[in-house]
Amino acid sequence: MNANRKSLEDKVAVITGGARRIGACIARTLHHEGMKLVIHYHKSAEAARELQAELHHHRPDSVLLVGTDLLDPAKLEKLVSQATAEFGQLDVLVNNASSFYPTPVGQTTDEQWDDLIGVNLKAPYFLSQAAAGPLTVSGGCIINLVDIYAERPLKNHPVYNVTKAGLIGLTRALARELGPEVRVNAVAPGAILWPDGDVDEIAQQRLISRTPLKRTGNPTDIAQTVLFLVRDAEFLTGQIVNVDGGRSIVP
């Protein structure tokens, strides 16, 4: 270990949507560095309990699970207060939870709009607002998970695209609002994990063919980038880090 590298031992992170997929990989990575975790989940209770048991096997009493609906503003403040009540501080907020599904123009409902905006943009804002106080005390940071589709819109997903573009704007705005005590950055994944459900293999291969590295990434690529932003990037704020195999540079 680099002697000059900041230790994350006993630091505390809240990770939304941390029970599965990329969120779980981020949780494992930060926990491996000695952090205590508050893992939020909504409908993935079984996966959350399995992950907690796995992490507690390595370090007992280091993970708190909080199941809640991010569409309920009152519960967002409670999520932060539960973290500080359990572990006494908050050092990192990872806004990872996200809803993703098509909303073709002409077929989008009010409910879909409210759900996507609520989970992908409103919740990160109000969680960040609730966390700003303890993060200011600890000199901590916020990491938002955005998407390369924020700037390269995905067809038939206009509302999702808008939410991620908004989250990029929020990342930069919060960096100005909360600095110098709190750093705020974002990670924009490319093709890492395909969405749950039906998979269009032709579309997958088309995307990979337009990626300079000619392959997909994996959740560890995202988790290691989050770790870098948390631990090593002390002079970085308001930045969006694309982890996409170069897809964002290809027309």
Language model features by range: what are they?
Residues V12, A19-R21:
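Conserved glycine-rich cofactor-binding loop
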